[in-house]
Amino acid sequence: MIYEGKAITVKALESGIVELKFDLKGESVNKFNRLTLNELRQAVDAIRADASVKGVIVRSGKDVFIVGADITEFVDNFKLPEAELVAGNLEANRIFNAFEDLEVPTVAAINGIALGGGLEMCLAADYRVMSTSARIGLPEVKLGIYPGFGGTVRLPRLIGSDNAIEWIAAGKENRAEDALKVGAVDAVVAPELLLAGALDLIKRAISGELDYKAKRQPKLEKLKLNAIEQMMAFETAKGFVAGQAGPNYPAPVEAIKSIQKAANFGRDKALEVEAAGFAKLAKTSVAESLIGLFLNDQELKRKAKAHDEIAHDVKQAAVLGAGIMGGGIAYQSAVKGTPILMKDIREEAIQLGLNEASKLLGNRVEKGRLTPAKMAEALNAIRPTLSYGDFANVDIVVEAVVENPKVKQAVLAEVEGQVKDDAILASNTSTISINLLAKALKRPENFVGMHFFNPVHMMPLVEVIRGEKSSDVAVATTVAYAKKMGKNPIVVNDCPGFLVNRVLFPYFGGFAKLVSAGVDFVRIDKVMEKFGWPMGPAYLMDVVGIDTGHHGRDVMAEGFPDRMKDERRSAVDALYEANRLGQKNGKGFYAYETDKRGKPKKVFDATVLDVLKPIVFEQREVTDEDIINWMMVPLCLETVRCLEDGIVETAAEADMGLVYGIGFPPFRGGALRYIDSIGVAEFVALADQYADLGPLYHPTAKLREMAKNGQRFFN
């Protein structure tokens, strides 16, 4: 053994060839943390000191290569002054440089995934051989930063600036064949031949058949582009990427600027440019929010995994109610491998559901994400039925009938008598109390809510609602099934609107107040889209459906009359009464035309102003900042109440629910992190400025206490 640590070992393989193996003890994956970096330095020193070493193969002792840097250490590191961050990155890069500068050839054998620092380690090697099943990429832009261990320096010099910009700015994982095509790897082999492939490359380099020094040299030099080529490549890329990323996500464009600035430098000076830009991004609020989201997502996954121990295996599912929603649920279950019965009382609804599933599967085939054979397999896994004949062996039933408590109670009671005693019943309701629906059941312990968001195939969130009598097994089984469907489940307790809709309707309430105060809804949409929402509140209402919003508003007003009941007519009332229901019937706040792709396109329709005129009670002058606060303050305060009321267990789950469920701007991190970014005391003072607008704007006593004590939701 040449070197042995807790994360890295170096040992002889054969005739002067050594293996530098990453295998971080006590962890399921390899990652770059302080320990790993320190051991890499020691391992490289040990290799350099051993005259018998003729070549080095870098590989992993786990199912994946290296997943990147340890994000938990980012939180502490990014609090350091900018100069210390730069120094830390340069120190890490000296370790990578020392490996790259070894006097012997090096080969990285890539299995599983090599992301971020994992790929940057591979780029420091002379050659890379990749398993056919492996994936590589530099996803740092998704955290509001860019690669900091040499990725913006080595990758452009290896695969060309255009390809490197595409890889870095997109932050996607890349398949082996794509990596080989652009020259990011030198060979692709079957997983079982990975070590043999690496040995073949290293032996050819040792023998002189391959010139490893010539292979290494371009990574040490400036980019091979003249001034005109640089201007064309970088300026065009910056314009395109800025348009794609938008103004709230600076990292992709900053990565291009770093590559451009370092283009005429050799490796060491170029790495200094990279480190300086990395440190600047690391200190932004965007990076703080996106890293916070990543950590929150990891927390969600840990909590969901904790349910696995007692969850029952779902081998056969069923959905009650076909149509678009039922078809979407059936598609998601089938395409992820769980066969599902789709029942309705009407043949036309069954056909609508099957058509929806078939359309979604067809779209995946067209995009190359599914083979025709797999499409046929998924379609065969959806069994339409008009009866309960095959329900005896169903493990979970998702009820997705009309949003009416009496109808849902009747259907749930009926199906309960058709399934085995331990089958789970789950209602896909968006607002109706789970405790109320449970009253119709003989086995309420087997009943939960399972709230999918529309469209099912696109929205990542599923709210799993625990009723007063829901058993831990019922909750755990539903969480496990949601995960199996490829969704991110969050467990919430029962209340009107649960988490997401309870928080969303105060936001809509703020919007209604603005319209009643004479503020142009088109202006409101523009302001909130600029704030970061994927669509403004008027457009969102049209997409959701004015009738759906009207019904949901009434449910919330009944549940929380002290702050959500408004005696005055609102914009939603006026549109509902005028039968302007949004996209579904072509007119809501906006009118809708069909574009060339057959998609609805919104256009301004002046006739809506006459519909809204009776509900405008004043003409108040408001700034864009006022518009944001009228809407965001009640949303944030209701999120605080959900946490305080125990509807959601943690701040992480609350924020992720809003990001995944309603498109809360990710770069702002979620409602509670948004409060943190303002400062709890400052947010309370801000809310107090709008106290005259009603109880939705009144901070809770506990939040005032947090403000007084200087507390935050996230440390």
UniProtKB/Swiss-Prot annotation:
A molecular-function term among this protein's GO annotations: 3-hydroxybutyryl-CoA epimerase activity
Record region (3-hydroxyacyl-CoA dehydrogenase): 312-715
Reactions listed under catalytic activity: a (3S)-3-hydroxyacyl-CoA + NAD(+) = a 3-oxoacyl-CoA + NADH + H(+); a (3S)-3-hydroxyacyl-CoA = a (2E)-enoyl-CoA + H2O; a 4-saturated-(3S)-3-hydroxyacyl-CoA = a (3E)-enoyl-CoA + H2O; (3S)-3-hydroxybutanoyl-CoA = (3R)-3-hydroxybutanoyl-CoA
Signal peptide: none
Listed Gene3D superfamilies: 1.10.1040.50, 2-enoyl-CoA Hydratase, Chain A, domain 1, NAD(P)-binding Rossmann-like Domain
Keyword Lipid metabolism: yes
Catalytic residues as annotated in Swiss-Prot or TrEMBL: H451 (for 3-hydroxyacyl-coa dehydrogenase activity)
InterPro entries to which the protein is assigned, alphabetical: 3-OHacyl-CoA_DH_CS, 3-OHacyl-CoA_DH_NAD-bd, 3HC_DH_C, 6-PGluconate_DH-like_C_sf, ClpP/crotonase-like_dom_sf, Enoyl-CoA_hyd/isom_CS, Enoyl-CoA_hydra/iso, FA_oxidation_alpha_subunit
Residue segments, region Enoyl-CoA hydratase/isomerase: 1-190
Summary of subunit composition and partner proteins: Heterotetramer of two alpha chains (FadB) and two beta chains (FadA).
HAMAP family documented for this protein: FadB
This protein's name: Fatty acid oxidation complex subunit alpha
Lineage: Bacteria, Pseudomonadati, Pseudomonadota, Gammaproteobacteria, Pseudomonadales
Gene coding for it: fadB
